[in-house]
Amino acid sequence: MASFFSDFGLMWYLEELNKKEFMKFKELLQQEILQLGLKHISWTEVKKASREDLANLLLKHYEEKKAWDMTFKIFQKMNRQDLMERAGREIAGHSKLYQVHLKKKLTHDYARKFNIKDQDSLKQKFTQDDCDHFENLLISKATGKKPHMVFLQGVAGIGKSLMLTKLMLAWSEGMVFQNKFSYIFYFCCQDVKKMKRASLAELISKEWPNASAPIEEILSQPEKLLFVIDNLEVMECDMSEWESELCDDCMEKQPVNILMSSLLRRKMLPESSFLVSATPETFEKIEDRIECTNVKMMAGFNESSIKVYFYSLFQDRNRTQEIFSLVRENEQLFSVCQVPVLCWMVATCLKKEIEKGRDPVSICRRITSLYTTYIFNLFIPHSAQYPSKKSQDQLQGLCSLAAEGMWTDTFVFAEEALRRNGIMDSDISTLLDVRILEKSKESEKSYIFLHPSIQEVCAAIFHLLKSHVDHPSQDVKSIEALIFTFLKKVKIQWIFFGSFIFGLLHESEQKKLEAFFGHQLSQEIKRQLYQCLETISGNKELQEQIDGMKLFYCLFEMDDEAFLPQVMNCMEQIKFVAKDYSDVIVAAHCLQHCSTLKKLSLSTQNILSEGQEHSYTEKLLICWHHVCSVLTSSKDIHVLQVKDTNFNERAFLVLYSHLKYPSCILKVLEVNNVTLLCDNRLLFELIQNQRLQLLNLSLTFLSHNDVKLLCDVLNQAECNIEKLMVADCNLSPDDCKVFVSVLISSKMLKHLNLSSNNLDKGISSLSKALCHPDCVLKNLVLAKCSLSEECWHYLSEVLRRNKTLTHLDISFNDLKDEGLKVLCGALTLPDSVLISLSVRYCLITTSGCQDLAEVLRNNQNLRNLQISNNKIEDAGVKLLCDAIKHPNCHLENIGLEACALTGACCEDLASSFTHCKTLLGINLQENALDHSGLVALFEAMKQQQCTVNLRGLRITDFDKETQEFLMAEKEKNPYLSI
């Protein structure tokens, strides 16, 4: 079907207007063009244009979507609702056509693609409860409205794709979202990744029933679009691109990672809605970079579902209860059973062991043990004790395939990959029969492991059996590289890989491997792992990069009572996020053996706030006590960071009791985004610790009464807090009055960060305190505080009178050139003591640089100026560079990121490099510098009198010639920040 717009055209609509209406349309059109700041069309041309001429003029001067948007807006102003409704009916026609197509696709093609074995599950009628569940998925609990971005989190195999399929099917049948969405488009990230480059229009066209997708029409109502993005983890995009790299053109081809970032970071189609499925690890990696309005968790099987499944598999009810209790008491194994296919694996594995007359307790020791038992049983006939040579070769080939997949992020394998790793065509049917492999629905003759975790354990077995140099793929790296990659969470799809390696080193697992493969394993692997852990223990920088939870699971799976304290007593800093009860158990298991810690950073999210049955709560609190015990067992612990955590009263009291212990000598306490479901006074009792020097409460909600309690502590003579950070704590202007007494009376407080609070009217109170002769504050951060014009006069007075304030950050406020002029009036005074000024994102233009230049020429104390993300342009930089060359200027660092600069300003910058004897660093990232400009900068830096280090250049932002030039310069000077 051709596009609705090309079928009926603008002229068709304009023909519906009478002569008087047509003239009115032209007048409103001129107003609309001016208001939108669009390319001008002369009134003479518009006035004399016929309906056909005017339609052609609009389509010639503006893109089709913009022309139609303006036309519909003018129709609305003219009260021609009938024309709007007619367009809506035509658009709805396409929507209905698409719904019919989607339903057909879901019940046929997608049933295979989503690995749904029983298509009847898609043909069943949806109940009202089903529909309510789907609708609620896209309703925010906080606002009750439709959110723009919903993340559906869940581990692999939990059923996310099936849930999305059913939701789309319900929409295609007209049962949900009928007044909300005209179109729902499904993008499978496996398919998107294969495309390498694509436009959004291309992705939509692939989903359309024929070759002529009405793209302009579909995109004309972006608020009526829902994009379902499935398996985001496959894309491996971290959303870290600069804003300038993102794209807002739906028709433009981009690398698919850029396209995905542009959609999810709301650069493209910000009015549309998104439902995104991903693993928890993926969401954790990108949550700070996207505006996610809702997060939904898919929990999988609950306890009763797991119990029902076990009872359906075992005949003896008493024996079943025994087996289920064994699983339920092992929290790690119980968590595995929440994934349906893994629940089947665990249950069938235990059943086989019982049938063979073995004790199931031993294989439930750790999950590594259960996985290896399950896999080895697949290759050993029921009546045999040992596998055949063929079975050994098949498993060895399978493990080689798994390792290649883990290192290349491959989870769907073509037959060629199987052959490359020693799996013969004749072996495939056997591997399918035992259900360790399944046919993939992605493409013909391709295969997947039953579950990604089975691929991980097979890959781990490969590394225990052979060296990476024996693998047919060079992508497979050493055991050392594996461990560091796992512990640093470089590859987010590696969930168990590293911990399985450690688990396989347990004596019982070594015996199983040796029995299956018929030869003794080398102890070299164990030595290499020990060496890795020794490297970590002796390297503070490396410890900062290690994910504590990954390390804990490795040590837990290894289950070596002698080795555990050796490792833990070498750690000086640990950071971890516990997301469930299992995580807390494993963290407690390791941390109670640690006595050398200096810094601990933790998050327990909602685990310690949820109401649970009594026995569960008691066990959880015991584990939490063991976690907190590190605060008293480690005699040198100075830093505690608690983030993104909700505490009930009992849980907080456990932490409180350890922090109040006399041997706890904290100097730094950070409590960020923490909610106390108890009396907040307990928190403020903690900060009365006289050893405390830094307190960070940012992102933690503080009531007015909380602020009073905080300031009461700060006003105490015994308080030694030098640095206070209360950014984004929901502070109000009235709270500023409470801080007045602290600023005047405290002789210790030197740094105060109040950023991201709405303080506008409170600045007058703060300023009076800052002007007081007893105020000793040195650093003040007021970034993103919604400051208005009046505030600049108050702060100007502070800069004139305060003789201790050396750093001021007022970034992300509407300072503008006028406000900057007021501040610069104070900064040009000869007795100004300010050393550092940050005015990023302050709407400063070229004009404001005149006042900054005057400051640089007169203020000999200013060393650091951060002016990034202001449109100062080349002319503004010229003014600054001329001032930097002045003998009175002692500037050392300047930040000019994203200042709309071009290569034309580089000569001025180069000149300042060679004339200013104090300038050490300049950041120019996110500016459109060209080859000749960069050559000029690097030539200047080669001069003997130049001390400047250029920062922020990213090689990939330039053309090939410039990239080669930068690489050559980097080779000459490895210290360059490129």
Curated annotation (Swiss-Prot):
Protein family membership: Belongs to the NLRP family.
PROSITE patterns (alphabetical): DAPIN, LRR, NACHT
LRR repeats: 594-617, 694-717, 746-773, 802-825, 859-882, 916-940
Domain NACHT intervals: 148-471
Entry protein name: NACHT, LRR and PYD domains-containing protein 4E
Keyword Metal-binding on entry: no
Keywords: ATP-binding, Inflammatory response, Leucine-rich repeat, Nucleotide-binding, Repeat
Residues involved in ATP binding: 154-161
Known role: May be involved in inflammation and recognition of cytosolic pathogen-associated molecular patterns (PAMPs) not intercepted by membrane-bound receptors.
InterPro entries: DAPIN, DEATH-like_dom_sf, Leu-rich_rpt, LRR_dom_sf, NACHT_NTPase, NLRP_HD2, NLRP_innate_immun_reg, NOD1/2_WH
Residues in Pyrin domain copies: 1-93
Pfam families in UniProt: LRR_6 (PF13516), NACHT (PF05729), NLRC4_HD2 (PF17776), NOD2_WH (PF17779), PYRIN (PF02758)
GO molecular function: ATP binding
One BP term from GO: inflammatory response
SMART domains: LRR_RI (SM00368), PYRIN (SM01289)
Origin: domain of life: Eukaryota
